[in-house]
């Protein structure tokens, strides 16, 4: 009887080892192989693009089988051409670049919306405090914004339109350095300024301006614009994305996970993971504390917000009005990821 028990034990061990080897082979076969891609980013180390570095540092790209190289570059027609042939897999930049691309015949669209507020504050010159009490009183005011295509100018235009005013009802003042801007606010040469942190805090600390409207938080943005304001997106060439749907899905999945992480952690916890940003514009804790308010919870593009942003841009650039806004974004990849 003893030899039989020994034989049975040896057989059991053999089968166990064989089973483990088989499972290992299956696991290896199922594991995603790293796909080398290039991701273009309009500002790798800026807070509005925080999800890019965070996804990289958290290993979320790797988890989805992606070996990602980040390329620092501005959005352009040349980049769109590289998106079309796959030299670059995707571009992280402001949503309005998809409207520009579509107006020029390039089929680019956002595949995930990461930031849904401008990431600014509208500050009023302290000498006007009390004299102007609501956004409906912006008519005739002088606002320091940005260049014509900038998110700051689009924000100012959208603020006017939402109040039933025209974009010609205010005077846009070109931005300068923050010391000069502070002087303009103090000397009565400007009434308002649209600014991010840490500049907004600088104007407040200098005693020349105070926050009039919060354009960082979702709640504040809805109050000021009537909807959220899509800013940071990942966009792709749609013919390329349709030809490589798994690649698009893996990228979107990594960013959906990153948005969940941002919404579940404190500014201090997040700052500890992105020393590159902290070493730059995030030196002051309030920069990241304010910045993380910009980010969506799920990555879906709200149709009403996309249309309203297009309206604000088209008010200054009428040629963009011909763009079919439904072609500037898709929620299909995010919806697939969220169903998992």
Specify the residue positions occupied by each region the protein language model found:
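N-terminal secretory signal peptides that target proteins for export/translocation
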Residues: 1-9
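Small-molecule pocket liners
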Residues: 50, 116-122, 209-210, 230-234, ...
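Bacterial N-terminal signal peptides
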Residues: 12-25
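Conserved C-terminal helix/tail region of periplasmic/extracytoplasmic solute-binding proteins
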Residues: 310-340
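Secondary-structure end/capping motifs
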Residues: 241-319
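Short, glycine-/small- and polar/acidic-enriched structural segments
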Residues: 31-168, 172-175, 191-197, 208
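Pocket-lining segment of extracytoplasmic ligand-binding domains
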Residues: 96, 180-274
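Short, solvent-exposed loop/beta-turn-alpha elements that line the ligand-binding surface or hinge
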Residues: 63, 216-227, 293-304
């Amino acid at each position: 009887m003893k030899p039989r028990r020994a034989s049975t034990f040896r057989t059991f061990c053999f089968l166990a080892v064989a089973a483990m080897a088989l499972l290992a082979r299956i696991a290896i076969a199922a594991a995603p192989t790293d796909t080398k891609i290039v991701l273009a980013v309009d500002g790798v180390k800026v807070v509005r693009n925080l999800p890019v570095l965070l996804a990289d540092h958290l290993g979320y790209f790797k988890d989805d089988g992606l070996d990602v190289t980040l390329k620092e570059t501005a959005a352009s027609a040349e980049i769109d051409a590289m998106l079309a042939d796959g030299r670059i897999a995707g571009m992280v930049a402001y949503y309005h670049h998809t409207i520009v691309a579509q107006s020029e015949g390039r089929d680019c669209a956002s595949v995930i919306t990461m930031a849904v507020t401008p990431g600014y504050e509208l500050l009023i010159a302290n000498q006007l405090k009390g004299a102007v009490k609501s956004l409906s009183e912006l008519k005739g005011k002088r606002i320091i914004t940005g260049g014509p295509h900038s998110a700051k100018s689009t924000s100012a235009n959208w603020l006017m339109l939402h109040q039933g005013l025209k974009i010609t009802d205010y005077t846009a003042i070109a931005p300068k350095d923050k010391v000069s801007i502070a002087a303009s606010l103090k000397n009565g040469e400007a009434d308002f300024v649209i600014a991010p942190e840490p500049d907004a805090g600088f104007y407040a600390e200098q005693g020349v301006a105070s926050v009039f409207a919060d354009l960082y938080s979702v709640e504040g943005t809805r109050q000021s614009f009537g909807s959220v304001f899509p800013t940071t997106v990942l966009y792709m060439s749609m013919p390329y994305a349709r030809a490589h749907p798994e690649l698009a899905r893996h990228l979107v999945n990594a960013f959906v996970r990153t948005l969940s992480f941002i919404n579940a952690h404190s500014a201090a916890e997040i700052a500890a993971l992105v020393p590159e940003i902290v070493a730059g514009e995030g030196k002051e804790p309030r920069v990241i504390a304010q910045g993380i308010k910009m980010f969506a919870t799920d990555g879906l593009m709200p149709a009403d917000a996309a249309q309203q942003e297009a309206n604000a841009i088209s008010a200054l650039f009428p040629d963009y009005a011909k763009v079919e806004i439904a072609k500037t974004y898709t929620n299909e990849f995010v919806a697939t990821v969220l169903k998992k």
